[in-house]
C-alpha cells in the first residue's frame, strides 16, 4: 500500500490486487487452455487471469512473502510487463521489515521495480526513472 501511494505521488496510475492463490489461478488458466485445445471449433474460453488483466498495460508487479516461483506460475497468462518479487529464503533477518528489505519486496523495491519495468517498456524516459531513483 505504501508503494502504491508513492507511485501515485509520482503521478502514476496504480491498481492494487490481492491474489489469494496463485496456484488456483494457474490451475484455472491451465484448465481453460486444455478446454480450448480439446474443442478448437468452440468459442474460445478465457481464464480468470485474462478477465482481470487482459487489457492491462504498463508494469504488473507481483509481490509475495513466499518464493517468487509461486507467483511465476501465472506468468504465461499475464500481460507484458509482468514481474515477480518474492522472498526466496528464510531466517535471514530479525524482523519482517528487515526481511522484506533484504529480499527486495518492501515498498522501496516495489517502486524501483515498477519504474524500471516502465522504463524497459519505453513507457517512461530516463529522466523520470532517475527522478524517482532511490
Give, region by region, the residue ranges found by the protein language model.
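Thiamine diphosphate
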Residues: 1-134
Amino acid at each position: 500500500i505504501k508503494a502504491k501511494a508513492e507511485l501515485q505521488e509520482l503521478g502514476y496510475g496504480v491498481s492494487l490486487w490481492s491474489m489469494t492463490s496463485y496456484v488456483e489461478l494457474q490451475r484455472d488458466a491451465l484448465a481453460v487452455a486444455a478446454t480450448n485445445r480439446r474443442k478448437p471449433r468452440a468459442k474460445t474460453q478465457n481464464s480468470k487471469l485474462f478477465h482481470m488483466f487482459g487489457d492491462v498495460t504498463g508494469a504488473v508487479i507481483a509481490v509475495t512473502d513466499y518464493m517468487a516461483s509461486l507467483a511465476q506460475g501465472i506468468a504465461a497468462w499475464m500481460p507484458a510487463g509482468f514481474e515477480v518479487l518474492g522472498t526466496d529464503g528464510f531466517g535471514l533477518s530479525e524482523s519482517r521489515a528487515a526481511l522484506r528489505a533484504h529480499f527486495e519486496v518492501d515498498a522501496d523495491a516495489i517502486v524501483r521495480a515498477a519504474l524500471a519495468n516502465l522504463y524497459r517498456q519505453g513507457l517512461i524516459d530516463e529522466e523520470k526513472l532517475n527522478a524517482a531513483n532511490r
